[in-house]
């Protein structure tokens, strides 16, 4: 099960990231030994769930920025809508294609925002972190109703290409 994070350094990193992104409501932070990649779950009470492995402060900053951008953009709401549509229209393959496209778009957009917020110099480290999470095999497979940092090799390849091609557009960004 999930174990609440009590490490003050990690909680301060999360708080700093929430402040940087102007997020008022706190997001719960937990760890789970059964996952190898961070994930955000919950719609009314969102939680970021970290793998139980040791993560450095840079990695945690990237993870928190990524997951909090999903939270701020309400990506969970859109994923839940797709999940509900899939329940009602379970026989329609286009609903599943739409779900994959929504997930892909959310991740690419989120990666872009992370790099723009954290700076151009973080592209390589952020990409390396994504690769490390894809290499780890999760016991829990993600669903459309969750937001994860990684999905698979093909999507990772597309995400890394987009991250590396990203040019600094302007100093102001609306998240």
Residue ranges and their predicted role:
Residues 1-175:
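Membrane-embedded and juxtamembrane structural elements of multi-pass membrane proteins
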